[in-house]
């Protein structure tokens, strides 16, 4: 990845938004979260998408560029997770992010409520043959030690965790095995990014700042990181 900062899933909501990322300083292009069927349920606005099959041509197009493409997926069953991961991997996605951080996922799949379900989901996700990671909710109902052990055992590469102490820092302190950590929310400055990387994060995702600033956020963060590094 050319730069350690990327957009968060769901922040680039149109094909034009996604294509604009190609000319930016982002380290990767993260797509909107996709489901097996088109999702238009009014109670779950954050999950609305046209269905995975409408995004596959865009993945194939983006895969021809130098930037990594991250497909974000959500499913109601372990089988749906496995199916979506394989579909996007075959289309050329560089990595697959399965979100557990959504109310619809918590109400249907509920991957963090049962160790057997978690292992089944993680195994099917990792079987796609691409690097995979899981996006965690702000509050995880199981011990991080058990969570990370299950993910690593199944072959999942990393997790996306919040910037709060109860998120990525606590996870890294309690994790029984090495796992890549991507900080998923709450960072707004180059200083924030540097601190997260110094604490062990592999990369960060930006959500609200990207929505307000657009693709210019990446160049700004890069400039701020350079200034911080030069001042030390």
Positions of predicted regions on the chain:
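N-terminal capping/small domains of soluble enzymes
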Residues: 1-69, 74-79, 221
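Hydrophobic faces of well-ordered beta-strands that scaffold small-molecule active sites
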Residues: 5-9, 27-31, 69-73, 96-98, ...
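Glycine-rich phosphate-binding active-site loops on the catalytic face of alpha/beta enzymes
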Residues: 31-37, 95-105, 158-167, 187, ...
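Glycine/Thr-rich beta-alpha phosphate-binding loop at enzyme active sites
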Residues: 40-49, 100-116, 138, 142-177, ...
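Acidic (Asp/Glu)-rich catalytic clusters
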Residues: 21-24, 57-66, 85-93, 123-127, ...
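Catalytic cores of alpha/beta
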Residues: 16-21, 79-90, 140-154, 175-183, ...
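Alpha-helix-loop-beta-strand connector modules within alpha/beta enzyme cores
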Residues: 46-68, 112-138, 167-183, 221-232
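A general structural motif
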Residues: 2, 26, 66-68, 93, ...
